[in-house]
Amino acid sequence: MRSIRTRTTSRASRTSGAAKAAAAALTAGALALTLTACGGGDGKDKSGKDTSGGGESSSASVKLPKLDGQTLEVAAVWTGPEQDNFTKVLKEFEKRTGAKVNFVPTGNNTATFLSTKIEGGKPPDVAFLPQVGVLHQFADKGWIKPLGSDAQAQVDKNFSAGWKNLGAYKGKQYGVYVKAANKSLVWYNTAAFEAAGISKTPKTWDDFLSTAQTLSDAGSPAVSIGGADGWTLTDWFENIYLSQAGPEKYDQLATHKIKWTDPSVKEALTTLAQLWGKDDLIAGGRKGALGTEFPKSVTQTFSGDTPAAMVYEGDFVTANINADTKAKVGTDAKVFPFPAVGDKAPVVSGGDVAVALKGGEGAQALVTFLSSTDAAEIWAAQGGYISPNKEMDTAKYKDAVTRDIAKALLAAGDDFRFDMSDQAPAAFGGTQGVGEWKGLQDFLKNPKDVAGTQRQLEADAAKAYKNG
């Protein structure tokens, strides 16, 4: 996901301990069943009653202090529809507390943005970190505050041990993962599939490539790739690697216990090149993909005169579909699990952790609210969001597709694999234009250079892990 990182010895051990319990595939079979079972996604139950949610709960689940006259600042990576949806959550906090909250987008390099703010003496009150490693880095520097008793109570009540552990460090709870992501989903344009005579979604990588060729032959750009944003390319690699090499190797590469020159990486890159090396299967070809940012990769799949047929990315794709296209999730836009490359289909999870950078009552109150079912249900009603909050009312989700994805996440409990690049040092796994992001962009540009890509990735990783 949009990422950044830093690693320490204790963090590495936690990634293979608590984060090993906090880093595995959601049950792919169960996910496949729930996605297959998704209907039209109209947000109604069998009686026709609206169950999609629409704002705050009828009764508040958390008590908040009065903060009249206070102005808070919250920073996160989101822009466009994701920012608009989150703003509705902030509006409810303002209504209940009397505070004013200003949202500041960080850009893709979240850690760099926040570091500059903090070192300049002007940190936001609350920030969302897209990477668990940055939480550790900031905690070591004393830049973030442990959760207060009210926020801790919400975390203890609403989140499983695995998600709690991801927000903890050296025995203290610093943050809460209030936004999760299933990053092993392929979204498809049903009209393009129908026009090409395709009635079944692919289950394996070979089937996926065959489906892409059929779509291309029928006149549809098969796969839309947002290659201008390097984080999307890391997600492609992680899904292939997890399915092909398996969870043990995945954990080892995530902690740099094996090198990027390992044969398993060669195999994954070679597999990825089966798609990335075919211009006719990519919307705009490789050059076009490298000039396409993530939001456009979604909109060009569900709008325009010649839309692409498929786009890979997480559940948050629905936010862009809902806001920027006329397509209806569950009807015009459907989804299937990332195809199995090895014995099992992968499911990679990601998320954003809310942390307090200031010690005041306002920052703690906002984190407390964000940890509540109230905030989760308001956010869920907007679409493009799933929550690891196990106590929230899943009927509040905007559409049936997202609701079933969220239920699969909750059903997995603590059994999930976390985004690999989000476990790496910031300089390798989470900064635009360098490290893994740049390495995979170069590989998309020249998919024949597997060995050269491996060498460059290993050189960048070795430097980043040594310094991190």
Say what each PLM segment does:
Residues N322-I386:
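Extracytoplasmic/periplasmic substrate-recognition and gating elements
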